[in-house]
Curated annotation (Swiss-Prot):
Membrane topology: Multi-pass membrane protein
Pfam families noted in UniProt: CobS
GO annotation, cellular component aspect: plasma membrane
Molecular function GO terms recorded: adenosylcobinamide-GDP ribazoletransferase activity; cobalamin 5'-phosphate synthase activity
UniProt EC number: 2.7.8.26
Pathway: Cofactor biosynthesis; adenosylcobalamin biosynthesis; adenosylcobalamin from cob(II)yrinate a,c-diamide: step 7/7
The protein's name: Adenosylcobinamide-GDP ribazoletransferase
Source organism: Clostridium botulinum (strain Hall / ATCC 3502 / NCTC 13319 / Type A)
Swiss-Prot/TrEMBL keywords: Cell membrane, Cobalamin biosynthesis, Magnesium, Membrane, Transferase, Transmembrane, Transmembrane helix
């Protein structure tokens, strides 16, 4: 039980700005086991946002609430995944060789492509969530972050790291297939309950396809994965999921 709590808190500490203030075991095995809790943490964040939406929907217009929810997400996660998307776009669209792309991705300064990617990402999320709320599909506020994190877990099944060192290396190739299978089944069951089997299957397949295509792009550009590409994958997974929901 103690190890389970350790791994759960480790995911909160690593992926959010929530102050855990606890000395935790941070070995690779802890991150391997803790991967189970990554979608769980996402569902908790999404659940809080959903409650905020329910609490405000009688007082504020939905478009204002969605902006506040996006702001809340950025604050509680530190913009971790969006930053990964921005860094990835800065590097990949620079049209340089592998070593230079990785150097650009490591640069803390945001370039033109990263800025454009972040703006488009936020605009898409805003419009998609706003449109889904108007369609009485506000449950997407909870489900999208979960699916995004699951896309990260599938990407991490690869052992291809683009750098010798990096925060992403503690996850890349350090995944347990039974854990991913279990958390995927739970997520699919939850989605089926709220969305129905047809939408669940189509949206999940679409996210897997986008994840795999993005993986091929990473291999082509930098011959592997980094922490930034994991964050980018999360954003792509969420956007894909929301797009499918709106189309259905």
């Amino acid at each position: 039980m103690k190890s389970i709590l350790n791994d759960f808190l480790l995911m909160i500490q690593f992926f959010t700005r929530i102050p855990v203030n606890k000395n935790l075991q941070c070995e690779k095995v802890n991150f391997r086991r803790g991967a189970f809790f990554l979608p769980v943490v996402a569902s908790i964040i999404g659940g809080i946002e959903f409650l905020v939406y329910l609490g405000l929907k009688n007082f504020l217009p939905p478009n204002v609430i969605i902006v506040l929810l996006l702001l809340f997400t950025a604050m509680i996660t530190g913009g971790l995944h969006m930053d990964g998307l921005a860094d990835t776009c800065d590097g990949f669209f620079s049209l340089r060789d592998k070593e230079r792309i990785i150097e650009i991705m490591k640069d803390s300064r945001m370039g033109a492509f990263g800025t454009i990617a972040m703006i488009i990402n936020l605009l898409l999320k805003y419009q998609l969530l706003y449109s889904l709320v108007l369609k009485d599909c506000s449950i997407a506020i909870i489900l999208a972050p979960v699916i995004g994190r699951i896309s990260i877990l599938f990407l991490c099944l690869s052992k291809r790291t683009a750098k010798k060192n990096g925060s992403g290396n503690i996850f890349i190739g350090n995944m347990s297939k039974p854990i991913i299978f279990l958390i995927t089944i739970i997520a699919l069951a939850m989605n089926t309950y709220f969305l129905g089997l047809k939408i669940t299957i189509i949206s999940f397949i679409a996210v897997l396809i986008i994840t795999y295509l993005f993986y091929l792009l990473c291999l082509n550009k930098i011959n592997g994965l980094t922490g930034d590409t994991l964050g980018a994958c999360n954003e792509l997974g969420e956007i894909t999921f929301l797009l499918i929901l709106l189309m259905m």
